[in-house]
Curated annotation (Swiss-Prot):
The keyword Repeat applies. One of its GO terms (cellular component) is cytoplasm. Keywords: Acyltransferase, Amino-acid biosynthesis, Cysteine biosynthesis, Nitrogen fixation, Repeat, Transferase. InterPro entries: Hexapep (IPR001451), Hexapep_transf_CS (IPR018357), LbH_SAT (IPR045304), Ser_AcTrfase_N_sf (IPR042122), Ser_O-AcTrfase (IPR005881), Serine_acetyltransferase (IPR053376), Trimer_LpxA-like_sf (IPR011004). Gene3D superfamilies: Hexapeptide repeat proteins (2.160.10.10), serine acetyltransferase, domain 1 (1.10.3130.10). This is Probable serine acetyltransferase. It comes from Azotobacter chroococcum mcd 1. Signal peptide: none annotated. Residues 256-269 have a biased composition (Basic and acidic residues).
Amino acid sequence: MSLLAQWREDIRCVFERDPAARTTFEVLTTYPGVHAIMLYRLAHRLWRPNALPRPAAVVRARLVSNVDIHPGAVIGARFFIDHGACVVIGETAEIGRDVTLYHGVTLGGTTGAKGKRHPTLGDVVLVGAGAKILGPITIGANARVGANSVVVQDVPEGCTVVGIPGKVVKLREAGQLNPYGIDLDHHLIPDPVGKAIACLLERIDSLEKRVEAGGLVAAAASSTFYEGCNPDNSICETNLRRSAPWSSGRPRRPAHAGDRVSGRAKGSD
């Protein structure tokens, strides 16, 4: 594909993914992400691994768009950086077709060694603002990476990964995939603190009901925690059992204050 054809495809995809885009002139003059990818396409054609200095188009792209794309990176057609700013794409990064990045995304390395050290993104991947994808890992086709996530492990196809470190929170079926939908499932971000609190509230509610029903022995001897808790979590055990504070089946009557006083008096005799 010629350079002009690549530029044309990169511009067309903007109208499919950004509802604010109105005219080609507007896209060409006001979209820094488009400026960055156009200059990258030129620099990539001129780049040679051992050539010094780097193509001037790379420097120009940084000054104009505040986007740093190494000319050695391999980027497929119809690539779009929305709100292009503070995006970094390393030398050995590989990006498939129809990929969308938002501002603040880093496709970085975790080692200074030569060779493959940056991530590979499959086709139709969407990466939210501020996300960091680090190391020679693979993000499968149609995957979604939530905003501000830090991903250091492979992500299967069709999955949504969110959080620090990134965790898979949703797997989409083929019929559920929306190539350009901004469905990052941020509401599924893991919340271990909230989960632990939910466990405790569930336990308190259960104990209160048993106490009100008069089941003091049963409440003290066996308690079931919030059903969604992780059995391996020491805070949220699904079957926590405590020994009863009395040996017989009947609760022991607390000593009256007067009895304790009289007991001390008897002991002093």
